[in-house]
Swiss-Prot record:
Taxon lineage: Eukaryota, Fungi, Dikarya, Ascomycota, Pezizomycotina
Record-given protein name: Peptidyl-prolyl cis-trans isomerase H
Domain PPIase cyclophilin-type: 15-181
Family membership noted in the UniProt record: Belongs to the cyclophilin-type PPIase family. PPIase H subfamily.
Organism: Neurospora crassa (strain ATCC 24698 / 74-OR23-1A / CBS 708.71 / DSM 1257 / FGSC 987)
Reactions accelerated catalytically: [protein]-peptidylproline (omega=180) = [protein]-peptidylproline (omega=0)
Length: 182
C-alpha cells in the first residue's frame, strides 16, 4: 500500500476496513470535503473515529456496523449503527438529524460519499457511496466526500449478491470491521 498523502486542501482522510462474510475485503480511504461542507464532514469523521458519544456517554460510530443496502449500478448504503437495517440514524449535534448544509457538490462520478436521508434536512449517520454518476440525486442529497483509494473494494461490495434477506440486503454481511482517521 502506498504511503498516505494528505490532500493539499487540508481536508481529513478517513478509512474503512471492510469484511465480507467475516473475511477481509480491503480498505477504502475517503477524503472528506470539510472545505465545502464542514458540518457534514465532521459528523462523518466523528463516527469514523468513535469520538461521538451517545446520551449515556458511550462511544458510537461505524465500527462493527453493516452496509445494509447494496444496489448494483447505483450505490452501497451504510451508517445505521443503531439498528443495522436502515431504520436508525443519529448525528453528533445532539439531535436525531441536521439540516442540509448545501448542494454545491454534484453526484457526477462514481466513488462519492453522500448523505442518505428521509427528505429535506434529515441528515444523520446514514450515508452511501456511489458506484456510478447519479445526477438525479443533485439537490436532494449532500455530497461530502470521495473515495481516494479502494474503489476496487467498493466494486467488490457492489457485486455482493443480495435478495436472500430482503430485496437490496446483502446475502453475506458487509461490515466496517475497523475505521478511523489517517
Amino acid at each position: 500500500m502506498a504511503p498516505t498523502v494528505l490532500p493539499a486542501s487540508g481536508n481529513p482522510l478517513v478509512f474503512f476496513d471492510i469484511t465480507l462474510g467475516g473475511e477481509p475485503l480491503g480498505r477504502i480511504t475517503f477524503e472528506l470535503f470539510k472545505d465545502v461542507v464542514p458540518r457534514t464532514a465532521e459528523n462523518f469523521r466523528q463516527f469514523c473515529t468513535g469520538e461521538s458519544k451517545n446520551n449515556l456517554g458511550r462511544p458510537q460510530g461505524y465500527k462493527g456496523s453493516k452496509f445494509h443496502r447494496i444496489i448494483p449500478n447505483f450505490m452501497c448504503q451504510g451508517g445505521d449503527f443503531l439498528n443495522g437495517d436502515g431504520t436508525g440514524s443519529t448525528c453528533i449535534y445532539g439531535t436525531k438529524s441536521f439540516a442540509d448544509e448545501n448542494f454545491l457538490l454534484k453526484h457526477d462520478t462514481p466513488g462519492l460519499l453522500s448523505m442518505a436521508n428521509a427528505g429535506p434536512n434529515t441528515n444523520g449517520s446514514q450515508f452511501f457511496i456511489t458506484t456510478v454518476p447519479t445526477p438525479f440525486l443533485d439537490g436532494k442529497h449532500v455530497v461530502f466526500g470521495k473515495v481516494v483509494d479502494g474503489m476496487d473494494v467498493v466494486k467488490k461490495m457492489e457485486n455482493t449478491k443480495t435478495g436472500y434477506r430482503g430485496k437490496d440486503v446483502p446475502n453475506l454481511d458487509v461490515v466496517i470491521a475497523q475505521c478511523g482517521e489517517m
